[in-house]
């Protein structure tokens, strides 16, 4: 049976067709780089929204295999940190990291290194990724390692991106609380659940934590990098993760470069770390992942 698009998503689609919000709409909640990225993302996806009907958006091919559980991949039974290894060619904060790298080859390195899950950047303008990267990675692992889960790492603003993530083989999507209204979060989270995808709620402060919990988030990541100014501070995880309910899977994101960093956030209660730049640059991802789990 095909999952149906939630009614609020239909309403949001119609609103989005009529008026793509400009950066100024969200300036009160964001500033600088994040505002720029979100404004661009809304413009970027507008043609994709106009090109599909509500029925197209609601239809997720029932023949697609059910994706493996992202949440389950982050719950290790040995007390060690789960590691979400990210494929990221560049970023606004670091600049070029490994521009020419093959997403599938890097994914194979991560799998061999013992990564618990993968995060694949699909934003092209700012991070050098694409949906084709995600498709290639999930296709490569569908038979070789079907339990390996992938997060579609992008700036999600509309259900069409969730339909794309499902079609491309993702197991989870990212919801950046700071960048979205509560109505938008509700639409995205509802549609992700209908599509069988987990949602990683990303927060940066107590107010965003409360909003994520209000929406029923089961996986919450503390981004140690302030996306408005791109400054990193691991003390954010140390301050916020102890405030998570016990049932919530806690992820610490960004600014984790070695075992000492990983130990800090694990001591605060993190179940998993999401690491991109350090693993992309590591001569041996296996050695670095082992260091994270010491």
Spans of model-derived segments:
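Active-site mouth loops of central-metabolism enzymes
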Residues: 87-102, 148-157, 200-202, 252
């Amino acid at each position: 049976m095909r999952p149906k698009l939630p009614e609020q998503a239909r309403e949001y689609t119609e609103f989005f067709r009529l008026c793509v919000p400009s950066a100024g709409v969200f300036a009160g909640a964001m500033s600088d780089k994040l505002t720029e990225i979100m404004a661009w993302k809304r413009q970027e996806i507008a043609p994709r929204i106009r090109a599909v009907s509500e029925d197209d958006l609601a239809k997720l091919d029932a023949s697609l295999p059910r994706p493996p559980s992202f949440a389950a991949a982050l719950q290790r039974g040995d007390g060690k940190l789960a590691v979400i290894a990210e494929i990221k060619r560049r970023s606004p904060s670091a600049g070029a990291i490994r521009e020419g790298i093959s997403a599938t080859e890097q994914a194979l390195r991560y799998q061999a290194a013992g990564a618990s899950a993968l995060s694949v950047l699909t934003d092209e303008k700012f991070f050098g990724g694409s949906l084709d990267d995600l498709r290639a990675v999930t296709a490569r692992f569908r038979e070789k390692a079907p339990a390996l889960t992938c997060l579609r790492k992008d700036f999600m603003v509309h259900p069409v991106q969730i339909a794309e993530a499902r079609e491309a083989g993702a197991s989870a999507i990212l919801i950046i609380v700071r960048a979205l209204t509560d109505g938008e979060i509700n639409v995205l989270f509802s549609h992700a659940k209908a599509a069988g995808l987990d949602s990683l709620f990303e927060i940066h402060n107590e107010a965003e934590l409360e909003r994520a919990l209000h929406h029923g988030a089961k996986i919450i990541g503390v981004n140690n990098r302030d996306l408005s100014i791109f400054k990193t501070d691991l003390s954010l995880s140390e301050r916020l993760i102890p405030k998570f309910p016990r049932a919530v899977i806690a992820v610490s994101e960004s600014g984790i470069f070695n075992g000492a960093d990983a130990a800090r956030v694990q001591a605060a209660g993190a179940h998993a770390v999401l690491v991109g730049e350090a693993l992309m640059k590591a001569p041996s991802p296996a050695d670095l992942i082992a260091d994270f789990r010491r």
